[in-house]
């Protein structure tokens, strides 16, 4: 279950980090195609840790999407970034993709399309939960 304490709308800043351009940029394209307006990708293999931290620091009240492949494939980088977020970016909400974020008919390992769709599923679920709390 996602716990979001800030307002989450289709205008909330969403950042996704990844190492494969198709997955990382594909999430951005799919989210934008579904009405999310402030979406960006961080390609960890082409962006320095300092640049990533600067982007996080300058993005309060944002959603940071982290795929399972990032946690498994880049454990030192992710440990460093998650520690940085905890200490320096208290209003950045981190969501690590889990199996429940995928459609039920997803094949394993998931295809690029299925990985990208998981990001949309996450954002739509948070949006729905945020809407259910509004009076």
Each PLM stretch: what is its role?
Residues 13, 62-63:
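Structural motif
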Residues 37-59, 122:
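A short, well-structured beta->alpha microelement
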Residues 1-13, 125-135:
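Eukaryotic N-terminal low-complexity, Ser/Thr- and Lys/Arg-rich leader segments
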Residues 60-61, 90:
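Proline-aspartate-enriched helix->loop->beta-strand connector
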Residues 4-42:
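Short, charged N-terminal beta->alpha structural module
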Residues 18-23, 70-74, 100-101:
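Gly/Ser/Thr-rich loops at beta-strand to alpha-helix junctions
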Residues 63-84:
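Conserved phosphotransfer microenvironments
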Residues 82-132:
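Ser/Thr/Gly-rich flexible loops in soluble cytosolic domains mediating phosphotransfer, phosphorylation
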């Amino acid at each position: 279950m996602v716990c979001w304490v800030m307002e989450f709308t289709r205008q909330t800043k969403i950042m996704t980090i990844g190492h494969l351009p198709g997955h990382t940029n594909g999430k951005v394209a799919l989210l934008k195609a579904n009405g999310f307006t402030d979406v960006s990708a961080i390609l960890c293999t082409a962006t320095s840790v300092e640049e990533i931290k600067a982007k996080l620091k300058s993005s309060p009240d944002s959603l940071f999407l982290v795929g399972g492949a990032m946690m498994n494939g880049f454990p030192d980088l992710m440990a460093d970034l998650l520690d940085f977020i905890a200490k320096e970016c208290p209003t950045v909400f981190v969501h690590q993709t889990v199996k429940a974020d995928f459609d039920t008919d997803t094949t394993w390992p998931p295809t690029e399309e299925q990985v990208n769709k998981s990001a949309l599923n996450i954002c739509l679920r948070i949006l729905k939960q945020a809407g259910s709390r509004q009076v």
